[in-house]
């Protein structure tokens, strides 16, 4: 039995956005840490910190909202490549998300990066998720 921590993280963030929660706790793994760093770097979240409880560790993400109505910065967060169906792309065929307004997070041979970085470095890889 395998467990998809990336899909869990995406579901937790989407649910927290719908509840307009300020903070959300996601499982800490190497891949989720890289995804969280990209979300912070691209301005989708305010901050994050690592919390350890006994044998498990988590990231506490501080989500970003706009204005008085608290519109979430993350409009959509979708898992693309799944354990049951892996999706790969070379750098020329990586699609621009909403004409460059969103990002694709890609796992390449040089690590996890955004679609823009992958195109600049001319690297293809597994398309993990889309965020806008």
From Swiss-Prot:
GO terms for molecular function: rRNA binding; structural constituent of ribosome. The keyword Membrane does not apply. Pfam families: Ribosomal_S8. Gene3D superfamilies: 3.30.1370.30, 3.30.1490.10. The keyword Thylakoid does not apply. Keywords: Chloroplast, Plastid, Ribonucleoprotein, Ribosomal protein, RNA-binding, rRNA-binding. GO terms for cellular component: chloroplast; ribonucleoprotein complex; ribosome. One of its GO terms (biological process) is translation. It is found in: Plastid, Chloroplast. Part of the 30S ribosomal subunit. NCBIfam families: PRK00136.1. Belongs to the universal ribosomal protein uS8 family. One of the primary rRNA binding proteins, it binds directly to 16S rRNA central domain where it helps coordinate assembly of the platform of the 30S subunit. This is Small ribosomal subunit protein uS8c. The gene is rps8.
